């Protein structure tokens, strides 16, 4: 009769079925799904299972007398079973040969050691099969509150013999044929994964990896995974393959310590700079405060302050530049009134001359913004991927890894969703306030008005985009805005004396003016543009005279 046999240690609990001899359940101990996390009855809090309803299989295919044999249909008997060791065998009809799966689990480890052996099958398996196909299949259950985001971050990762780690498309139906030999292949979910690793070699090429939504899939299912692999077979009396099967959370330090590149599955940003910021600044700082036992809301606040302190010299320069432009506003308004709309180039030259006389670099305020952008975008990757925030509450947010809903709507608003995230509202409100403070110092004119409109539209766009994102991310953006507003007010009213700054600008006007290389290039570009406009308008004027 079919039976299940289990192995477990302090971290994982694994179940195997005698039919097929492969794993059918993999539980991460101490972790729960979003549904079980908040159950009042602790006895009902089942550990999180990476496999949906015994849906996993590890199927070997080979031929005997030109008939295909699939190991998933064979019944394996238990040859040895302890709390951390299991040996399963499927015998031939005469019991002279067998396929053997040997599993062993060390204490306090996420790794299952796997040995696949073919014993006495050299006359059973038809000649011509130097490799035995191994089809690894699994359906992953839903684990998180936001199913669409969970599916969008679920995929198959793999490491090739060249050492590069790649993935197929994320979410839904994706397929890829990998033309290199593969060292490991991993079925990744949003915060957890299980990875099959070939020890002392690689799975031979080609390897096919695919994900899809089962036709019957409902809200309890994430994705179905399939990997078409092969293992070597030498037609000897005893042929074996050693593998390792890891079932673990996507925790950066834990995976990095394994030295196999498994941490590359964690999305820290596609652009190298974003990934570097997360690897060498954000994660070390985050882990340092985590080891002190601080709450994650406080850790995010401290992380925000540290980043703001690092950027404070640039921010100070930006605010000084903004203050200078604000003091020049009356003169800039005069120039706007002086020149007609068709004299844009002349007006621009006059503005540049005014800036040069006052010692103002109009691009000085842009550099700090450009420097801050990589940090903002790095956080966009870090917070939704940080398993430390999973099911960790703060204030009204029950789980900082997903959205914080203060109101569930009975309908869905296009581009917004069917819930209201308070942290997203706070982020949007403070972004608009900070935008207002900055835009009040901008120049006037048609182009500036269009830019101001865009600056106010962007927070509204983010309101829709980020409403279903991590509460931790929106909380960080909210704190970043609040700190920026406080820094702005402090610098403007406490650290910058506008009267002294005005006197300094007047003194600069009295000095002989030497054009900087940048200003000279800008004026040269303006003159070239003016000449191009004249050349383009000249033929039109001649045509007009001919008609007259």
Where are these regions (language model features)?
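Soluble non-transmembrane domains of integral membrane proteins
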Residues: 1-264
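Helix-loop-helix
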Residues: 16, 114-117, 143-149, 199, ...
